[in-house]
């Protein structure tokens, strides 16, 4: 199974890239993690609908057919660590690859959010996109560690 993290925005600070890579390399071979960063649409005088459409096209192009889509959204379901671990286990048993999608500065296109198989949120707080990448990969690793009985997660 593969976890594909699709993130709008190609530039992140070095500290965020280093932290992301540190967690990504911890996953076992049977649970591959891949990051696909897609270009943010230049803002200028474009309408929000135009921006959403351009970023949605890039996101959809980055996600292979048959992949389960999970949109990160402030209106999504809030999960505990145990609930995310259970969700990860379900995804693994289902056998499909999963794409977790992080939107751009204005979030995700409303139609894309609605079409996603699931919508989850990481926090009630507004977070910088670089931080979301790190928080997401860390929480996925923590969920894996719960399921594997690895000592990383402590109650």
Curated annotation (Swiss-Prot):
The gene is rlmH. One of its GO terms (cellular component) is cytoplasm. It comes from Paracidovorax citrulli (strain AAC00-1) (Acidovorax citrulli). Keywords: Cytoplasm, Methyltransferase, rRNA processing, S-adenosyl-L-methionine, Transferase. GO terms for molecular function: rRNA (pseudouridine-N3-)-methyltransferase activity. Its EC number is 2.1.1.177. Its main location: cytoplasm. S-adenosyl-L-methionine binds at residues 72, 103, 122-127. It is an enzyme of class 2 (transferase). This is Ribosomal RNA large subunit methyltransferase H. The lineage of its organism: Bacteria, Pseudomonadati, Pseudomonadota, Betaproteobacteria, Burkholderiales. Belongs to the RNA methyltransferase RlmH family. It is found in: Cytoplasm.
